[in-house]
């Protein structure tokens, strides 16, 4: 009689090593996936801080992420307006800005032509309403110079040469004769130098070079620390203005989105909880048909029904109103979620309350609803996210005036105004990142309620 050989058993230590190795590989895979996803987010955020986020190659070190530049920006902002955080140029402002040029040996380093130009804040609507310019109040003078030298490698021979350098210290002061002048957000500066000279260092990096490097241009030499880092984010608020009122359009878009999102959350919770409880507990003719219609409505794209819905809103005079966007998709899948939750709610509790004389609505209002907070929170989060990110219906129903748009449709307006030929993608990226902050904060605060096990624990 043949005997089957016994299976070889691995030692306990070997099994543990295999388990640890398997766990380590899984852990590394998840870390790699998280790094790729988070890395893309981080790079996009870093690009939103840049003046030119489309630059090639993409630099990882620049003034907006350099602590030394933060301190310099704070010092210049404090000297210009007494505000180290947001900077500016105000009466009493007096600052010194240093730049260093170099030239080949034997070449005299000349003083560059310095100017505080009459420059508008950007390419947006603020340029049409801006009235105060630093050039009207700034007194520019050369405070002094100092000579030095630096080592430069010759690309042709590979040898190191000693080139002379000269540092120019420019003083920019607010005109004392105009001491009652306004606070000005920006202090631009341009320096035009001969082609033989090269700018090698400055207190703040130039915003751009023009005329093949002859002209070094700064949009603002008094930014303050936060003004330097979050310049694009500040511009989103200050430069997107309503020409008729002068108010910030982007701030109004954010407010409109909050109103619509909270309005849809309230109506969704009210209607979905009532409809879900009715479908889960009340037995009446046509209940299954209604539930089937609810499921069927979830399969129909919004683009299929938007013409009929648009005509209805037009006939009722609801176009260009926030209420139309709130009610257009107020229930849908939320009824299904609430129905599933109520079906798992213990019937014994409801029956005991009915025996004690409580009405059906009283059971729902006093017993079922207070114990449904996990499901309500999940529905509220989903409704808020859907309303906040909704683009199609606000685009169709909200067309005028410009301050009536939501933030998602407003971002399209930013893209048309600042992107494309203007190429001001830093501001567009900053607006996009501001728009995701509310949803991101919401998920961070209430993420535990999204998990299904939390819902079941709430029933228990």
Predicted regions span which residues?
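Arg/Lys-rich, alpha-helical DNA-contact motif
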Residues: 8-9
């Amino acid at each position: 009689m043949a005997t089957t050989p016994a299976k070889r058993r691995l030692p306990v230590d070997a099994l543990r090593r295999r388990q640890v190795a398997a766990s380590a590989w899984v852990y590394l895979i998840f870390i790699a996936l998280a790094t790729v996803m988070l890395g893309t987010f981080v790079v996009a955020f870093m690009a939103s801080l840049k003046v030119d986020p489309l630059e090639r190659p993409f630099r990882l070190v620049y003034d907006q992420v350099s602590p030394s530049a933060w301190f310099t920006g704070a010092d210049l902002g404090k000297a210009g307006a007494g505000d180290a955080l947001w900077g500016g140029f105000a009466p009493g402002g007096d600052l010194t800005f240093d730049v260093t040029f170099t030239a080949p040996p034997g070449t005299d380093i000349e003083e560059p032509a310095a100017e505080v130009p009459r420059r508008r804040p950007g390419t947006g609507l603020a340029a049409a309403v801006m009235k105060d310019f630093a050039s009207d109040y700034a007194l520019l003078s050369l405070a002094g110079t100092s000579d030095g030298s630096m080592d430069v490698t010759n690309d042709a021979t590979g040898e190191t040469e000693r080139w002379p350098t000269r540092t120019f210290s420019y003083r920019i002061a607010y005109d004392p004769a105009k001491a009652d002048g306004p606070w000005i957000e920006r202090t631009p500066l341009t320096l035009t130098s001969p082609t033989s000279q090269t700018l090698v260092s400055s207190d703040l990096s130039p915003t751009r070079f023009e005329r093949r490097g002859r002209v070094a241009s700064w949009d603002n030499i008094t930014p303050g620390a936060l003004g330097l880092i979050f310049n694009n984010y500040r511009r989103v608020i200050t430069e997107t203005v309503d020409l008729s009122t002068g108010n910030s359009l982007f701030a109004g878009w954010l407010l409109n989105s909050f109103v619509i999102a909270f309005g849809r959350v309230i109506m969704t919770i009210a209607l979905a909880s009532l409809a879900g409880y009715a479908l889960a507990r009340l037995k009446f003719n046509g209940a299954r048909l209604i539930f089937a219609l609810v499921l069927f409505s979830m399969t129909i794209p919004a683009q299929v029904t938007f013409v009929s819905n648009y005509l209805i809103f037009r006939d009722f005079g609801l176009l260009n109103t926030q209420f139309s966007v709130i009610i257009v998709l107020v229930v849908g899948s939320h009824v299904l979620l609430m129905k599933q939750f109520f079906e798992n709610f213990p019937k014994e509790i409801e029956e005991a309350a009915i025996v004690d004389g409580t009405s059906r609505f009283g059971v729902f209002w006093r017993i079922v609803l207070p114990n449904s907070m996990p499901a309500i929170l999940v529905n509220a989060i989903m409704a808020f996210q859907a309303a906040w990110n909704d683009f199609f219906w606000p685009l169709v129903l909200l067309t005028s005036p410009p301050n009536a748009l939501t933030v998602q449709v407003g971002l399209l307006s930013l893209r048309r105004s600042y992107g494309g030929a203007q190429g001001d993608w830093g501001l567009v990226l900053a607006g996009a990142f501001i728009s995701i902050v509310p949803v991101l904060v919401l998920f961070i605060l209430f993420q535990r309620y999204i998990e299904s096990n939390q819902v079941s624990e709430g029933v228990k």
